[in-house]
Structures are given as structure tokens and as C-alpha cells.
Amino acid sequence: DKFAINEKGGYLYVLPTSNTGSQPVNSLHVLDKDMNEVGVINEIARGESIYAARFVGKYVYFITYRQTDPLFVADISNPTAPKLLGELEVSGFSEYLHMWDDTHVLGIGYGDSQQSKIKLTMFDVSDPTKPVEVNQKLIDSSESWSNEFVYNYKAILADPEKNLIGFTAN
């Protein structure tokens, strides 16, 4: 995911999925200006892969995918001691996360592993230890659709002021 890397306050934050063993494993690494690791969270969602991430303020929100499809919230306010705060398992998976407002994250992806339904999800993250799926919308998809939002986040319109969400689908 192109949003799984972020620079803030002289630190580089990276959310890689490693496939070196029998199962993928995820982690959060914090590097200083000399590229020394100063903070880490290891062993996040073993057997799954990170599909979407968004760094906002002192938090990083990310979605993994395989058997279960959780939204994770991690606190990165202290670069030397990042903490995993909350997790919410939901059906489907998001390919893109967008901060809707101070307390809501919009997820755009699929409602099932066959990608037969596009899924819009609104997460309430006002309590980062207990994220909640407050709304979802499933839209029928088909093999002939070209869901550009999966590869190009610029194909998504998310306008909280006008309460609009749009994306391309051919």
C-alpha cells in the first residue's frame, strides 16, 4: 500500500508485510533520521497482509486481509514506543482508507474475497481502543467493472463538507 509509509517530525514510519516464512507477518517500524530503528511493533496479524493504511496525527489506521479483515489503530505519538490500541474485525476488506473527519475513517474496498461487491465502510475511531463500523454500503460489482480506485487513489472523491463519496467504475 502506497500509504504504508510516512515521515513526521524527523521520523520515518513504515508498515511492511514480510513474506520470509511460511506465513506473511506485519510490523510497524519507526526509523530516525540516520535510519536507525527507534521503535517497533512486531507480529501484527500473522498470516495476513496489509491492504490499506493511513497515517493521521498521532495515529495510524490500517487494514489487513486474509481470513479475517480487521481495522487496526496504533498510537505513534511516542516514536520510541508505538502501541497497538484497537482492532475491529469486519467482513470484506478495504483497499483505501480516507480520513473523513476527526473521528471517522472511510474505507473503500470489497465486501467479499471474490470482489463481487464494492464496499464503502464508515468507521468511528473516536475511541481508538474500540473502533466501530457505524455504516456500510455494498454495491454490486461485476467482472466487467474496472475499479480504478484500487490502483489509483486519485480516482476517489471524498468530500465530507458536501457529504459526497464518488469513484470510477467502468
Segments predicted by a language model, with ranges:
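Feature marking well-ordered beta-strand scaffolds used for ligand recognition
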Residues: 1-170
